[in-house]
Amino acid sequence: MASSTDVRPKITLACEVCKHRNYITKKNRRNDPDRLELKKYCPNCGKHQAHRETR
């Protein structure tokens, strides 16, 4: 079972525009302590949008 202090936890990325949660990925907490933000394709909007880590 994954602990809450896992070094590489699973995170969900949500579109900044439509707020749909489109992607699940992993991140390294030691290298990226802040919230992750990537520009990815949103199938709901139909174009590339900024996706941000959700809690």
Curated annotation (Swiss-Prot):
Q: Which UniProt keywords apply?
A: Ribonucleoprotein, Ribosomal protein
Keyword Ribonucleoprotein part of the UniProt annotation: yes
Can you list the GO cellular component terms from the UniProt entry? Answer: cytoplasm; ribonucleoprotein complex; ribosome
Q: Which GO terms describe its biological process?
A: translation
Q: Give GO MF terms, alphabetically.
A: structural constituent of ribosome
Say which domain of life the source belongs to.
Bacteria
User: Does Transport show up as a keyword for this record?
Assistant: no
The record ties this protein, via HAMAP family, to: Ribosomal_bL33
UniProt record similarity statement: Belongs to the bacterial ribosomal protein bL33 family.
Tell me the protein's name: Large ribosomal subunit protein bL33B
Q: What is the lineage of its organism?
A: Bacteria, Bacillati, Actinomycetota, Actinomycetes, Mycobacteriales
